């Protein structure tokens, strides 16, 4: 298992290096959507999550200046002041930090949604207001089963942010999808215990069946509330998908 993981890490590193060399100052963008905020979805991910719902069929290559101009053009009709950068996995984009700087200079409130795998190495360069890290599982074997990737770098990144939290100028939240019989109540408790070292904000979202890659069903409301109750034994700030709808209905803009 160790040799296999090392090979995977090497291949991922080589792939990321190749992407950087090929695209240079270009970013791969699928589309943007608009509701109470602009959501910019980047293309590509280093994880292969079994329950991933984001399967774009195409993307385009844009420089950060072109992306900024497109956002400003589209936003003329909406006058929104918040932008969520998600994916895919945004941290695969070579010029993410440059894009965040340009958007902040325009006065936008920036949120980044990431799996946290490559995040630690770019924390000092990003100019964002919020970072949401999706921790799939605390147990490494479960994480590998769900994503085909180890969670060691993700846990290390969360630990680093927790330790130096007061030195960063962004809010942070850790998110987990509650998946019955896989990432169940016992796993939620392990994650909550881990996060309690720094009392990081935690959000639990109920799994929604998108494909047949997981032998799992949507958790009922009682289970979601129980998961929240368990997490609150260790953390002061816990929310769940029953508390409010985070994503309002949006209009897709293909760019």
From Swiss-Prot:
> What class does this enzyme belong to in the EC scheme?
oxidoreductase
Identify the InterPro entries for this entry. Answer: Aldolase_TIM, Radical_activat_CS, Radical_SAM_PqqE_MftC-like, rSAM
Keyword annotations for this protein, in alphabetical order, are: 4Fe-4S, Iron, Iron-sulfur, Metal-binding, Oxidoreductase, S-adenosyl-L-methionine
Pfam families reported for this sequence: Fer4_12, Radical_SAM
Q: Which CDD domains match?
A: Radical_SAM
Q: Which family does it belong to?
A: Belongs to the organic radical-activating enzymes family.
Database matches in PANTHER family:
GLYCYL-RADICAL ENZYME ACTIVATING ENZYME MJ1227-RELATED, RADICAL SAM DOMAIN PROTEIN
UniProt protein name: Putative glycyl-radical enzyme activating enzyme MJ1632
Species of origin reads: Methanocaldococcus jannaschii (strain ATCC 43067 / DSM 2661 / JAL-1 / JCM 10045 / NBRC 100440) (Methanococcus jannaschii)
């Amino acid at each position: 298992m160790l040799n296999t993981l090392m090979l995977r890490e090497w291949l991922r590193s080589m792939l990321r290096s190749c992407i950087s060399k090929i695209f240079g100052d270009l970013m791969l963008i699928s589309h943007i959507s608009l509701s109470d905020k602009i959501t910019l979805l980047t293309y590509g991910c280093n994880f292969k999550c079994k329950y991933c719902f984001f399967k774009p069929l195409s993307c385009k290559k844009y420089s950060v200046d072109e992306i900024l101009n497109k956002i400003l053009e589209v936003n003329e009709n909406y006058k929104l002041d918040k932008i969520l950068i998600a994916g895919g996995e945004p941290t695969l984009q070579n010029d993410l930090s440059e894009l965040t700087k340009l958007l902040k200079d325009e006065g936008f409130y920036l949120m980044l949604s990431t799996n946290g795998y490559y995040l630690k190495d770019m924390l000092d360069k990003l100019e964002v207001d919020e970072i949401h890290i999706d921790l799939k599982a605390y147990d490494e074997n479960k994480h590998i089963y769900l994503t085909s990737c180890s969670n060691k770098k993700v846990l290390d990144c969360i630990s680093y942010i927790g330790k130096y939290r007061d030195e960063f100028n962004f809010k942070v939240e850790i998110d987990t999808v509650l998946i019955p019989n896989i990432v169940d109540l016992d796993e939620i408790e392990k994650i909550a215990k881990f996060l309690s070292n720094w009392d990081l904000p935690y959000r639990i979202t109920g799994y929604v069946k998108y494909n047949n890659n997981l032998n799992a069903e949507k958790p009922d409301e009682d289970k979601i509330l129980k998961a929240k109750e368990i997490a609150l034994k260790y953390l002061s700030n816990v929310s769940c998908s029953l508390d409010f709808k985070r994503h309002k209905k949006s209009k897709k803009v293909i760019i």
